[in-house]
Amino acid sequence: MPRADLDKRPGDVAAMFDAIAGRYDLLNDLLSAGQVRLWRRAVARITGAAPGDRVLDLAAGTATSALSFTATGADCVACDFSLGMLQAGQSRLAARKQRNPGRLGLVAGDALRLPFRDEAFDAVTISFGLRNVADPEQGLAEMRRVTRPGGRLVVCEFSTITITPVDMVYRRYLLGVLPEIARRTARSPEAYQYLAESISDWPAQRELAGLIEAAGWSAVRWRDLSLGAVAVHVARRPRG
């Protein structure tokens, strides 16, 4: 497959993630220096899922992030359009001895055409996946459709570091060092070249907040993590 570009053709992006599914979590830990685990915990805290809540975790990959929700007693649907990622997640879940109190289901689905009824979930989360949606605003509108009135949206995504000298160093790492590490360690290094380019091309915090509002969400706010390398945006579906 040629090096991934920024056209975000669903078939190409899904195939790219299928190719790296087996080592996805390991490489995420390596390339983020372990920070990805802290980011996942922050998303779980901010989402605040309670026992009995229904959570949709989009772009769930191997369902690692979904376990943070079922640990609270919430029921979670982990949805991804990469069958390879879901299959890797299913294998790991089957091998786990510990069982969380909440139920977990894995579903293949496209964020632009979610296979769920209207107002089915108390919360919808998407971590490091909105960049990969061909039409992010349409995807956000679909997330709104499947969220109950008053329900919440949590978007965790790479963003813009707020300290300019630090951001300059980070960009050099992102566009130079990270692809080289991936070339030496990953079976599909083009996936991580795509990662670097898609992060660099992604809107900053305030612009993303505007996109979320344009999709019909209200009370949009965000919290920076790791100096803004990652931002967690939170919003509500309006009542009525």
Model feature map: region roles:
Residues 11, 156-211, 215, 221:
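C-terminal alpha-helical "lid/dimerization" subdomain adjacent to the S-adenosyl-L-methionine
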Residues 23, 33-51:
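Conserved alpha-helix/loop element of class I SAM-dependent methyltransferases that forms part
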Residues 24, 124-125:
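Hydrophobic beta-strand segment of the Class I
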Residues 51, 147-152:
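Short glycine-dipeptide loop
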Residues 54-113:
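Class I SAM-dependent methyltransferase SAM/SAH-binding core
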Residues 112-123:
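A short acidic, Gly/Pro-enriched loop at the edge of an enzyme's catalytic core
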Residues 137-149:
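A short glycine-rich, Lys/Arg-flanked "PGG" loop and its adjoining helix->strand segment in the class I
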Residues 218-240:
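Core SAM-dependent methyltransferase catalytic element
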